[in-house]
């Protein structure tokens, strides 16, 4: 990092050229502001406010999901399970948006999302009742429960992949077994009703699998042609590759070289549109 020092009369102005930050994942934004110690015999620093010089680090995590869960708790008049350190005012606004939910999901619930639980809400009297809360700020991408963004170790254990596989070998495994993996991702995502909220579009939907004669409709992924974006472009898979059906994106795999995470996210709204007979969607 290069420092530029400019002196104007008795006032010393220190400006720092900041490196352009690397693009971070959507769900984590790190904002850092710091002023490095400047050592120059011509620059006086004894009168500089120490609060300005002291490095600060502010971490803004993906909080929409937590606010959404709090809003549901407020709507149903139940306790939020865990620590909540986000805006109650914004949660209240979301609660007002959820008004019609109780008309279509009239169950007594308890909040059960703590510690990465598979279900965000469970029936208080009937524990077979489950509800998953899914949010997106704008792009419509959501992760499956449990295995949506695991470490390499957890991914390998879950899919019975050799832990010694390199990331390139894991990519090859995904390409060769994508239909089987989508079956698993699908089952973990839609094993209970989903309350989906797209903040930018103001889309609020209760989504569940269509039930015909007591059986939930599913998708036979083995009969569907799935295309990877990097293959369509005749390029190698670097970090991200989307999967599509008839040129419509339905999901995305992300494998970063410098992060211990093998991530999959559904293009949720596209998935609902491509398979309309598979889902029952109630717009709220």
Where are these regions (language model features)?
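Primarily low-complexity, compositionally biased regions used by nucleic-acid-associated proteins
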Residues: 1-9, 30
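Nucleic-acid endonuclease domains
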Residues: 15-35, 39-284
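Ala/Thr-enriched low-complexity intrinsically disordered regions
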Residues: 7-12, 45
């Amino acid at each position: 990092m290069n420092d530029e020092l400019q002196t104007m009369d008795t006032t010393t102005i220190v400006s720092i050229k900041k490196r352009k930050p690397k693009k971070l994942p959507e769900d984590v934004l790190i904002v850092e502001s710091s002023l490095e110690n400047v050592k120059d015999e011509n620059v006086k620093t004894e009168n500089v406010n120490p609060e300005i010089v002291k490095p600060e680090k502010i971490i803004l995590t993906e909080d929409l999901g937590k606010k959404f869960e709090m809003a549901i708790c407020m709507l149903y008049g139940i306790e939020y399970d865990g620590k909540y350190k986000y805006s109650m005012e914004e949660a209240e606004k979301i609660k007002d948006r959820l008004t019609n939910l109780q008309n279509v999901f009239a169950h007594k619930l308890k909040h059960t999302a703590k510690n990465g639980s598979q279900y965000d809400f469970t029936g208080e009297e009937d524990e077979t009742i489950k509800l998953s809360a899914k949010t997106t700020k704008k792009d419509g991408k959501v992760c499956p429960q449990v295995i949506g963004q695991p470490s390499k170790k957890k991914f390998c254990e879950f899919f019975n992949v050799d832990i010694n596989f390199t990331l390139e070998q894991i990519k090859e495994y995904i390409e060769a077994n994508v239909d089987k993996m989508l079956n698993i991702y699908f089952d973990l995502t839609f094993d209970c009703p989903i309350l989906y909220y797209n903040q930018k579009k103001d889309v609020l939907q209760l989504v569940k699998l269509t039930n015909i004669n007591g059986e939930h409709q599913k998708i036979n992924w083995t009969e569907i042609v799935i295309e990877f974006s990097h293959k369509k472009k005749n390029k190698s898979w670097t970090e991200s590759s989307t999967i599509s059906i008839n040129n419509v994106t339905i999901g995305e795999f992300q494998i970063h070289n410098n992060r211990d995470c093998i991530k999959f996210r559904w293009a949720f709204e596209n998935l609902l549109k491509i398979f309309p007979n598979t889902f029952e969607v109630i717009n709220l």
